[in-house]
Amino acid sequence: GFLTRNDQMNLDYNFFQIESDAPGLRQRTTSLFFTNQWNTEGEPVRLGMFLNRGYNTLDNNTYDISLRYFPERIDDRLGRGTGDFKVQGRYGLNLGFRTNPADKLAFSFDLNLDQDELGPARTGASSGITWRPNDRFSSDLRLDYTDREALLVHKGKGAYTSFESHQWAPRLEMNYFLNAWQQLRFTLQWTALKAFEDRFWQ
């Protein structure tokens, strides 16, 4: 498997259920994840509980909801060897909607309500449109926006600065399938970030 770090101990649990007999729905999916990861010093570095529910309607539209809770943990990486700090417990909520992907024009909308490491709100929203005139060509235009009240940056020697930030990220992708084995893809993306110093930490 893939490890995000070389001093990691994991004990995770995943549950996934697909129901195809739910009244008024084509499909209902439920997933439950428990993430429990520690470093070799015995400190919790990644903890989380996730409950996800997806509803696929008879007209093939999809509604998603995700609830998340991150218990208190230790961040031992952002400081790059200058020290660890404690991250308080945080909550999160995701809402999503997608229209029928088989239509020539399909739309998607997502809302993400979360918290930064220091506790203040982090809000994200995205929308997309997909144009698929035939089975060989498709284009996808997506726009993401993120508003953060406490973007934490390590400035060196154990000094940190939190920023109020706003980020826009448009993305355009076009695909053309020459045949069953060959595909051409063109992707253009751009990210704009504006940040203002807010508080200083040591």
Give the role of each language-model region.
Residues G1-Q202:
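Exposed, low-structure sequence patches enriched in small/polar residues
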